[in-house]
Structure formats: structure tokens, C-alpha cells
From Swiss-Prot:
Oligomeric and partner information: Component of the SWR1 chromatin remodeling complex.
Gene that encodes the chain: SWC3
Segments of this protein annotated with the region Disordered: 1-34, 153-253, 323-577
Taxonomic lineage of the native organism: Eukaryota, Fungi, Dikarya, Ascomycota, Saccharomycotina
Name under which the protein is recorded: SWR1-complex protein 3
Statement: the UniProt record of this protein carries the keyword Repressor: no
Function, as annotated: Component of the SWR1 complex which mediates the ATP-dependent exchange of histone H2A for the H2A variant HZT1 leading to transcriptional regulation of selected genes by chromatin remodeling. Involved in chromosome stability.
Disulfide bonds: none
InterPro entries named in the record: Swc3
Residue ranges with Acidic residues bias: 323-335, 488-509
Length: 758
């Protein structure tokens, strides 16, 4: 019975061994006669020590309490009693080694390699805890979930790259197909167009018969006009004589006006500003309402203006438009035809001009700008009349007793506006007029005694570029010849008649288009300038593009690229030093940190996840604060039992993990006995700062956990060490402490020194 009772008693003790209270180093059977307790074989008390109670107190050195306490504290840190143990090297006894040898396994080859492979070294650093400094090694603990997530992300990126590559290849293929299709369609369109052109049959031209019909029709018209002009005026014959010449379209060419005429016009305008009577007279003459006496008086003003010197200030010569043939015929041929026709068609019944017409002839081509009141301007189309139009206008003026119709005010407004741009247009306009200037014979000058010689500067500039002008004009003639239609002679004659009638109707519309003419002339000048500039630039080489008065093209701004900053060797070394390995990049967030003491490499501990981490200024040092629960053994037993109850009725996927469960929120949990610890980690490279900072729980979660411990538990009170002992009453304790220090010193001495001591 005694044996059974003994067995039951031992079994009961084993079952209750897990729930035994921890003494936390307090020695059993302390001597109540002494004023202190023995904790870890060191004299401690809750109250401050009272050394005056000793009869024969020993010194601090002889008592050996201070040095023993430092040694005990360092051993406590190295054993990691405040950290959670993760891995420890296992030692096998002789029986286990013999069994492994029988199985053919070398016991020395078995090391906890599987556990070691799960830990990847991060760096070496220093830990400062209390008065101690420990060199430690930091490790990253491998996590299967992190590895799986990394591999999935890597595969997803790889799939995205493949999809993107396929899309790019497909886009390239489609682009190539579209390009080939466009090319094919273009070729088909060209082939169809060629076939259509081949199918077209060109109508054969009958130049001799058509021209004969046209000449016959024009000759009949000319005879009719000559008969009508014989009764009214001899000037009418010019229209019929030039009708043969006016076969083809005319184009306007700008030429400079005579210098004396421009000076006279400017002086007249200047006099009209100061003399109101002259201004009114100019308005009457321009409107065709002046009498013969007023015209005679106006002639005196003209003579006076001619005698005056040029006005002071800067002014530039004006240009006038002269119509020339647009086809390959030269002006010389046109003038010869006019002269021959005039000699043939002159009749003895030519009537002399009246005095009013003679006066109008002398005053014609004088263009003045009187100071008109608003709303009384004479409108014009901004285009000076040609030679035939001016002759026709003179004849109609004589019939209507209105001698002067060519004083066009809107034309003068145009000339004032064009003075600004004439300098730049001069070179291009001269380029267009060079052919007509060279081919005009002396007979034309005899036929037109009223025309004055051109300006000397204009003639010189025209003489500089004969070859270029001829090349340009020949190209234009070719274009005009290619643009001729293949219509019949009747349609050609009708178009000529229509063009002549449109030219005459233009003069009649001058009085109703004053404001529009000013704007249109401005636009026309600018467009003409652009056309002439493009023609000159296309014909000339790049070096000869700039001419007198022509504005140079704006210089293209040069694009500058910023130079990439050249990195020094130090910066390159810093960049290399800041680079992380692939494994370290995986665990840049949520890593589990493990460390080992260099003094005790057989054991590795986990850094507590419920810690508050603070990075210091140097970015290589950190303050780590956490709470140590001294009765964590009792709390751990309660946690495992409680999790079993909670997960019993749940699926495996819904099980609560230990790291997600806070036992201190349960009222049945044992009250924690805790103390706070703060340590310092130094010497951690900057590149690992993200890994270190993100390896702990968020600060809000840690604060809630610590608050639950502080609210439920009680802080462990500190003990006060007695650094002095009594020589007689504490003789054995002091001797034991001194012997322990002596033995600890012997471990640092060599074998030779040990033999000498022995």
C-alpha cells in the first residue's frame, strides 16, 4: 500500500508540476536573522541597505558582491532569459551516438542544419543592455508564406511581360500589314489612274483654222469699234487695235512710279493739309465735278508742286501695277502689233479732243490724297488699271464731260499702307519684272512719250539677276502653256471678251468698295510677297536667298539636353553599398528577426514582435523597448488550453493563431508580473533600415498589447543589493562569492599560467 500511495503521490506531483509557482531565484530556507534575502545567491532587500547594523563590515572589494552581481547580470543577458528561445544546439550522449553509428550515420555530421538553413544572416552589430555591451549577429528567419507570395508576384510579373510582349508583336504585325495594304492600295490607284489616262483620247488641235476664225471675229469687232470711235473720239481706236493683242490672260506686275511724279503727289498732299481751298478743289477734281476753270487752276497747283523740293523726312518710292501678257509672247511683239494696226486703221475723220479732254490728259496719272471728310472717300479695288483700260477710260470720260476719273483715293490709302512693306517686296517684285524690262524695245518708248525712266537704283538691282529671271520666266511660261485648255476657238474668243468686259466692270465697281479694297490690297500684298519669296527661294541656291530689303528667316532654336550628372567614385560606392540582395528584398516588410550572442553561439533568440522601435539620428542606431512577463510560463499554459477550446469547434482554416490571440484580455488569465526593458542596437547599416523598422508589429497594435498588460498586471519591484557584508556573520557567503570570482578569472588564463598557479 505504501508503494501504491507513493506512486499516486508522485503522479499527482508530476501533474501539478506545471502549475507550481515560480520562486524567481529566491533561495529556500533563508536565515530570518539576516536583514536581506538571497536572490541568485546575492544579498538583496526591498528597503535600502543599512550597513550600520554590521559589527565588522567588510569592504566592497572583500565582500565581492558588486563584481558577482555584474557577472550574474551578464550571464542572465547571455542566457537570454528575457527573450524567447528559437533554436539551441543539441548535444548527444554516448548511447545516442552508438545507436547512430549502428545505423551507419556519422553523429558529427548531424547538426541542426535544417534549422540553420532557415536563418539568413543580416549583419553584425552591438547590443547595449543596462551596463553591458554584447556583440551580436542578426538573422532573418525564412517564412514560407513570404516565399510563396514573392514567387507568385514574380510569376505574375513574368506573365505580364509575356502578355505585353505578345501585344507588342501583334501591334507590330498589324502595323506592318496596314502599311503593306496602304502601299498596295496606292499602287492599285496609280495603275487605275494610268489606265484611265491611256483610255482618254486627246482631241487634235487645229491651231491654223481656229486662230483664223478667231482673228476673223476679232477683225469684225475691230471694224465696228473703229466706226463707232470715228464719230466720238480717236482714242476709242486703241481698244479695237489692242483687241488682237489681248488674246490671252494678263497678269499684274509691280513697277516703280516715276520719281518726279511721286514728289509732286507728296507735295500736293502736304499743301492740301494746310490749304482748305485746295483740298476742296482736289475733292471736286477727283469726283469729276470740276469745271474747265477749276481744272486750269488745279494745273497751276500741280506745276507749283513739281517745282517744290522733296518733302523732308524718310519716304520710299511707290510702286504701280502694269499688266503684261501671261503666255510666251513678248511685249515687243505686242507693241509691234499695236503700232502696225494703228497705222492701218487710222481714218481721216479723226476728231480732235476738246479742251477739257486735253486738260484731263495732262492731269491723268496724278494720284493725290485730299483730306476728305469721313464718308466721302472714293472707293476702289486697289488695282491700278492697265494701258487698254486707261485708254478706254479716257474715251468714256470725254463722252461724259468728266475729264478726270483716275484720282482714286483708296489707291492712295493702299500706297501709304504699302510703304511699310515695299522695302521687303522690292527685290522679289523686281525679280518678276526683269524679263519685261529687258525685252521692251525702243519703239515702245517712242509710242509712249508720257512714261518716265525708272529709278536708277531699281534698274541697277534689276541688272544683277538676268539669268535667274530668265530661268524663272521660262519655267512659268512652260507652266502656262501646259495649263492651256483644249477648248474650241469660239469658247476662247468668248473667254477673251468676258475678261475684257470684266476689266471694264472693275472700274465701275470702284465707287462701291472703298473699305474692302483697303483690306484686300493689304492681304494681296502680303500673299504676293509670300509667293514671290517662295519662288525666289526655290530658284536660288541657299547662299543667294537673301536679297536687298528681304527679311532673313528666323533662326531655329537649338535644343540643349541636360547633361547627366557624373557620379563620383564615392557616390558609386555608396550606391553599391545600399543595394540589397534578392532575399533581403523579399523580407523588406514583416520579417522575423533572430539574433545570437557571439559569446554564446549555440543559442538563438527571437526579438519580440510587440516592441516599440525608434530610429536615432545616425540612422544606424535604434532604441528597442518591450515588456518582459516574468510568469510567462503560467500565461503560456493558459493560452494553449484556451486556444484548444476556441479552435475545437472551428474549421482548420478558421483556427485562431497564437500570435493573433491576446490572453490578457481574458479575465481568467493569470495576472502578469512584468518589468520593462529598453536596449540599444548600434552599428546596423543604413540599407537595412526598412527591414528593421518593418519587422515589428505596428505601433498602435503594440500600444494596445502593452496597455492590457499594464492594466491587468503588476510591475516587479526592484531589489537593493548589499555591497558590503559582515566579516563574521556573513563569513561563508563572502568566501563563496570570492571563490566564484577566482574561478571565473582562471577561465581567461592560459594553461601555462594555470600550472604556475598550481
Amino acid at each position: 500500500m505504501s508503494k501504491k500511495r507513493g506512486r499516486r503521490h508522485t503522479a499527482k506531483e508530476d501533474s501539478n508540476s506545471d502549475y507550481e509557482t515560480d520562486t524567481y531565484g529566491l533561495a529556500d530556507g533563508d536565515d530570518k536573522s539576516r536583514p536581506y534575502y538571497l536572490v541568485e545567491d546575492l544579498p538583496c532587500s526591498l528597503e535600502p541597505p543599512r550597513y550600520d547594523t554590521f559589527t565588522y563590515p567588510l569592504s566592497v572589494k572583500d565582500s565581492a558582491v558588486l563584481y558577482s552581481s555584474l557577472l550574474s547580470s551578464r550571464r542572465t543577458w547571455v542566457k537570454g532569459e528575457m527573450f524567447q528561445l528559437y533554436w539551441a544546439k543539441q548535444y548527444m550522449n554516448t548511447k545516442e551516438k552508438e545507436e547512430l553509428k549502428k545505423e551507419g550515420i556519422d553523429p558529427d555530421s548531424i547538426d541542426q542544419s535544417a534549422a540553420r538553413e532557415k536563418m539568413n544572416k543580416l549583419c553584425d552589430c552591438m547590443m547595449q543592455g543596462g551596463p553591458h555591451q554584447f556583440p551580436i549577429r542578426l538573422f532573418i528567419l525564412k517564412n514560407d508564406e513570404v516565399e510563396r507570395a514573392w514567387n507568385e508576384a514574380k510569376e505574375a510579373k513574368k506573365r505580364d511581360r509575356e502578355v505585353r510582349k505578345k501585344q507588342q508583336e501583334e501591334e507590330k504585325r498589324l502595323k506592318k500589314e496596314r502599311k503593306l495594304l496602304r502601299k498596295k492600295l496606292k499602287q492599285e490607284a496609280l495603275e487605275k489612274e494610268k489606265e484611265k489616262n491611256k483610255d482618254k483620247v486627246k482631241k487634235p488641235r487645229k491651231p491654223y483654222k481656229k486662230s483664223a476664225k478667231r482673228l476673223e471675229a476679232e477683225r469684225l469687232k475691230k471694224e465696228e469699234k473703229a466706226k463707232a470711235a470715228a464719230n466720238t473720239s480717236g482714242v476709242k481706236k486703241k481698244i479695237s487695235k489692242t483687241s488682237n493683242v489681248k488674246k490671252k490672260k494678263m497678269k499684274a506686275v509691280v513697277r516703280p512710279k516715276p520719281y518726279e511724279e511721286q514728289v509732286m503727289i507728296l507735295n500736293l498732299n502736304k499743301m492740301a493739309r494746310n490749304d482748305k481751298q485746295l483740298n476742296d478743289l482736289m475733292i471736286k477734281v477727283a469726283g469729276g465735278q470740276a469745271s474747265l476753270a477749276e481744272i486750269t487752276q488745279f494745273k497751276k497747283y500741280i506745276e507749283k508742286a513739281k517745282a517744290m523740293p522733296p518733302p523732308s523726312g524718310t519716304w520710299k518710292p511707290m510702286l504701280e501695277e502694269v499688266e503684261v501678257t501671261d503666255d510666251g509672247e513678248s511685249d515687243e511683239d505686242v507693241k509691234e502689233l499695236e503700232v502696225t494696226e494703228k497705222s492701218e486703221d487710222v481714218t481721216p475723220t479723226e476728231v480732235a479732243l476738246p479742251k477739257a479732254a486735253v486738260a484731263a490728259k495732262e492731269v491723268k496719272d496724278v494720284v493725290v490724297t485730299p483730306n476728305l471728310p469721313p464718308g466721302t472717300e472714293n472707293s476702289g479695288n486697289g488695282k491700278p488699271p492697265s494701258l487698254d483700260e486707261s485708254n478706254a477710260q479716257e474715251s468714256t470720260d470725254v463722252n461724259k464731260n468728266q475729264p478726270i476719273q483716275r484720282l482714286n483715293i483708296s489707291k492712295n490709302v493702299q500706297s501709304v499702307k504699302n510703304d511699310i512693306t515695299e522695302n521687303t517686296d522690292l527685290a522679289s517684285n523686281e525679280h518678276m519684272n526683269e524679263k519685261q524690262v529687258q525685252k521692251t524695245p525702243e519703239s515702245t518708248t517712242e509710242h509712249k512719250p508720257d512714261e518716265k525712266p525708272k529709278d536708277a537704283a531699281m534698274s541697277k538691282s534689276n541688272e544683277k539677276k538676268p539669268d535667274e529671271d530668265t530661268a524663272q520666266d521660262t519655267s512659268k511660261d512652260d507652266e502656262n502653256k501646259s495649263d492651256k485648255s483644249d477648248s474650241d476657238s469660239d469658247s476662247d474668243s468668248d473667254s477673251d471678251n468676258d475678261s475684257s468686259s470684266s476689266d471694264e466692270s472693275d472700274n465701275e465697281d470702284n465707287t462701291s468698295q472703298t473699305k474692302n479694297s483697303i483690306d484686300n490690297t493689304d492681304d494681296g500684298v502680303t500673299s504676293e510677297k509670300a509667293d514671290t519669296n517662295t519662288d525666289v527661294s526655290s530658284d536660288k541656291p541657299p547662299d543667294d536667298i537673301k536679297s536687298e530689303g528681304e527679311v532673313a528667316a528666323p533662326r531655329v532654336k537649338r535644343k540643349y539636353r541636360r547633361r547627366s550628372k557624373v557620379k563620383t567614385e564615392e557616390e558609386e560606392e555608396e550606391e553599391k553599398a545600399m543595394q540589397l540582395t534578392t532575399f533581403q528584398q523579399k523580407y523588406s516588410n514583416g520579417a522575423d528577426m533572430v539574433f545570437e550572442y557571439v559569446e554564446n553561439a549555440n543559442v538563438r533568440f527571437l526579438l519580440p514582435k510587440y516592441s516599440i522601435l525608434e530610429q536615432l539620428e545616425g540612422e544606424e542606431s535604434y532604441l528597442l523597448s518591450f515588456i518582459v512577463v516574468h510568469n510567462r510560463r503560467e500565461v503560456a499554459l493558459f493560452t494553449t488550453r484556451k486556444l484548444k477550446e476556441l479552435n475545437k469547434k472551428k474549421n482548420k482554416e478558421d483556427h485562431i493563431k497564437p500570435e493573433d490571440y491576446n490572453p490578457f484580455e481574458d479575465a481568467r488569465c493569470p495576472d502578469p508580473l512584468f518589468s520593462s526593458i529598453t536596449l540599444k542596437l548600434t552599428g546596423i547599416p543604413k540599407k537595412f533600415s526598412n527591414i528593421i523598422l518593418n519587422s515589428f508589429h505596428p505601433q498602435e497594435r503594440v500600444q494596445l498589447y502593452m496597455k492590457s498588460i499594464i492594466d491587468r498586471g503588476s510591475r516587479l519591484s526592484g531589489y537593493n543589493l548589499w555591497y558590503q557584508l559582515d566579516a563574521y556573520d556573513d563569513k561563508e557567503l563572502a568566501e563563496r562569492l570570492r571563490v566564484g570570482l577566482k574561478e571565473y578569472e582562471q577561465t581567461f588564463k592560459s594553461k601555462r599560467q594555470k600550472k604556475q598557479i598550481l
